[in-house]
Amino acid sequence: MKIKDAVNMIRWKYREKIDDYVVIIIDRLTENGLKEISFSEIDDVDNNYLYLKSEENTVIPLHRVLMIKRKSDNALIWKR
């Protein structure tokens, strides 16, 4: 499954529990090199980018996405 498809599946199929899901990305500015982004922060996704709901209009390239996890049981939904 492609990243875009996994993100859209969670956004639409599990929208009632959207806060239970996170995207883990590579972030060079953090100490451990990873950053969790809640699905509630995602505004849109296309073939190349995740678009976040923010004043800065943050755009994250999909090649930085490492995995998608469900927080409640730490289940791995998608992994590169």
UniProtKB/Swiss-Prot annotation:
Give the species. Saccharolobus islandicus (strain M.14.25 / Kamchatka #1)
Instruction: Output this protein's name.
Output: UPF0248 protein M1425_2629
UniProt family annotation: Belongs to the UPF0248 family.
Under the heading InterPro entries, the entry gives: MJ1316, UPF0248
